[in-house]
């Protein structure tokens, strides 16, 4: 059974992992007969957002503890992830990818990526293992790898221009499709950068998981 690493960034679209994207990813992996192995960085979130009002709250929350809500407690610290034990790696989106896994939300093209995630993704790539990034998560790829990549975040022109500035080749893509960088085994899909509902998000995420598993053969 193939083991697919899934990197989460909290719990909730505005300050962590996009919950629909995370659950759809886990569902697609399970339905494909593979096993999801979940990880999240063991650190404080950049902020905590009230998802009812959209306003910032004064409390603090831990990324790993929050992400454990999505996985029913089946999750490990990102520091424990080992590329040798995984067949592929998938990163759902949500603002947590741009706040907790990187600081793209605040620094844009000058952002940096969580060192544990960067090291893991690089090790996976060096081992010839595929990667899948969705929603805003592909914005981290130009900072993980120092070579040009074909990727998508959908059709948002402003974000696409930032990614091009970072050295990526951005490919416009509808919500129900994927962009595959065949040479580097990297698959991306817009998910909730474009999706208007969970069914639309699922259409592209299912394709991403399916292609990642094919590339893992």
Swiss-Prot record:
UniProt name for this protein: Glyoxalase ElbB
Family stated for the protein in its record: Belongs to the peptidase C56 family.
Quaternary data: Homodimer.
EC code: 4.2.1.-
Keywords: Lyase
Active site, per annotation: 135 (nucleophile)
One GO cellular component term noted in the UniProt record for this chain: cytosol
Record-linked InterPro entries: Class_I_gatase-like (IPR029062), ElbB (IPR026041)
Function: Displays glyoxalase activity, catalyzing the conversion of glyoxal to glycolate. However, this apparent glyoxalase activity may reflect a protein deglycase activity, which could be the primary function of this protein like other DJ-1 superfamily members such as PARK7, YajL, YhbO and HchA. Is not able to use methylglyoxal as substrate.
CDD domains assigned: GATase1_ES1
GO biological process: isoprenoid biosynthetic process; positive regulation of isoprenoid metabolic process
Taxonomic source organism: Escherichia coli (strain K12)
One MF annotation (Gene Ontology) recorded for this entry: lyase activity
Enzyme class: lyase
Lineage: Bacteria, Pseudomonadati, Pseudomonadota, Gammaproteobacteria, Enterobacterales
Catalytically driven reaction(s): glyoxal + H2O = glycolate + H(+)
């Amino acid at each position: 059974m193939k083991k697919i690493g899934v990197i989460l960034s909290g719990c909730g679209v505005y300050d962590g992992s996009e919950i629909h994207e995370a659950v759809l990813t886990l569902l697609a992996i399970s339905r494909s007969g593979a096993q999801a192995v979940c990880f999240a960085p063991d650190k404080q979130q950049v902020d905590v957002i009230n998802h009812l009002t959209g306003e910032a709250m004064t409390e603090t929350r831990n990324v790993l503890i929050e992400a454990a809500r999505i996985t029913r407690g089946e999750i490990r610290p990102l520091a424990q992830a080992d590329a040798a034990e995984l067949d592929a790696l998938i990163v759902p989106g949500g603002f947590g990818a741009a706040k907790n896994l990187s600081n793209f939300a605040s620094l844009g093209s000058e952002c940096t990526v969580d060192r544990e995630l960067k090291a893991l993704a690089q090790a996976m790539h060096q081992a010839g293992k595929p990667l899948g990034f969705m929603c805003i998560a592909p914005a981290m790829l130009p900072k993980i790898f120092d070579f040009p990549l074909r990727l998508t975040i959908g059709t948002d022109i402003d974000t696409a221009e930032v990614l091009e500035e970072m050295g990526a080749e951005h490919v416009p893509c509808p919500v129900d499709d994927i962009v595959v960088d065949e040479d580097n085994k990297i698959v991306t899909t817009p998910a909730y950068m474009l999706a208007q509902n969970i069914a639309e998000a699922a259409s592209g995420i299912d394709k991403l998981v399916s292609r990642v598993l094919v590339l893992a053969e």
